A protein has these predicted regions:
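Short, Lys/Arg-enriched N-terminal segment that forms or immediately precedes the first helix
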Residues: 1-6
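N-terminal helix-turn-helix DNA-binding core of bacterial DNA-binding proteins
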Residues: 7-49, 55
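Non-catalytic, surface-exposed connector residues within folded enzymatic/regulatory domains
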Residues: 11, 44, 75-76, 93
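Basic/aromatic recognition patch in beta-strand/loop cores that engages polyanionic ligands
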Residues: 48, 55-59, 76-78
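Beta-hairpin "wing" of winged helix-turn-helix
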Residues: 60-76
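Amphipathic alpha-helical dimerization/coiled-coil segments
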Residues: 89-110
Length: 110
């Protein structure tokens, strides 16, 4: 089976993460699982790639992080969750428009 090159998809990691965060706030492991599931296991994002994207997007104002305490029963651990901002929604829309154009151009060559 052919794997997707990380170089090819690198510019769209943010788009995939923002897509997931539009539905609801989430944390790293859950986002990673969602990307794997939605891509039908054709793309598995590396942990370092994921957390680098979180850092970059938070710095750019596309997402916000917050810590969620474990439930009232005390089970589990604190997790850092991420949520999309209005600026992140705008960025997502721009990246989707960019993808349509990119796909149109590349399809002329394959």
């Amino acid at each position: 089976m052919i794997e997707i090159s990380s170089d090819v998809i690198r510019g769209y990691n943010d788009t995939m993460i923002l897509y997931i965060l539009q539905k609801a706030p989430s944390y790293g492991y859950e986002i990673s699982k969602s990307i794997k599931q939605i891509s039908e296991e054709k793309y598995i994002i590396k942990e370092t790639t994921l957390y680098s994207a979180f850092t970059r997007m938070e710095k750019n104002g596309y997402i916000e992080s917050f810590v969620q305490d474990p439930g009232p029963d005390g089970n589990g651990k604190k997790r850092t969750y991420y949520r999309i901002t209005d600026l992140g929604r705008e960025y997502y829309k721009t990246k989707c428009e960019e993808w349509v154009l990119t796909k149109e151009v590349i399809e002329r060559f394959v």
